[in-house]
């Protein structure tokens, strides 16, 4: 099946929020605009996957709300992450953090260039998504610096 990757627009807020709610993941901030999302859509314009970035300082961001439908495979996830790197460069985000909540996720993320973060930047605590995510059992903070 064909999937189109694009940056979510303001008009996508309701459908993106519904997609995240259905996946039982955090949707706060989707409509407020402080988080940018990439979306993968199928040929009928249904969301099949998404990944968001919340800018937490002038050069740091928090990846959030990765949701992938069971129709997608690992190559689609890699494409989402690679495209997010381009979006981060465009917004001068040099260091990206995320909270991995499964051991298998951490292994995949290590292969994508992420490493375990030794310290937590104070700015991350301003993110409700971060504060909520880090309370998950087994949660690991990871980061990736560009350049």
UniProtKB/Swiss-Prot annotation:
Q: Which Gene3D superfamilies match?
A: 3.40.630.30
UniProt cross-references to InterPro entries, sorted A to Z: Acyl_CoA_acyltransferase
Q: Which domain of life is it from?
A: Bacteria
Protein's UniProt name:
Uncharacterized protein YwlB
Instruction: Write down the species.
Output: Bacillus subtilis (strain 168)
């Amino acid at each position: 099946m064909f999937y189109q990757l694009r940056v979510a627009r303001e008009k996508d807020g309701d459908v993106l929020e519904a997609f995240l709610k259905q996946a039982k993941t955090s949707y706060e901030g989707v409509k407020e605009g402080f988080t940018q999302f990439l979306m993968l859509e199928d040929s009928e314009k249904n969301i099949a996957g998404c990944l968001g970035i919340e800018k937490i300082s002038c050069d740091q961001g928090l990846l959030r709300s990765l949701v992938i439908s069971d129709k997608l495979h690992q190559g689609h996830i890699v494409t989402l992450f690679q495209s997010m790197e381009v979006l981060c460069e465009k917004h001068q985000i040099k260091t990206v953090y995320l909270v991995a909540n499964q051991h298998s996720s951490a292994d995949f993320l290590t292969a994508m260039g992420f490493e375990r973060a030794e310290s937590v930047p104070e700015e991350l605590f301003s993110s409700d998504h971060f504060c909520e995510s880090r309370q998950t059992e087994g949660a690991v903070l990871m980061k990736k610096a560009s350049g």
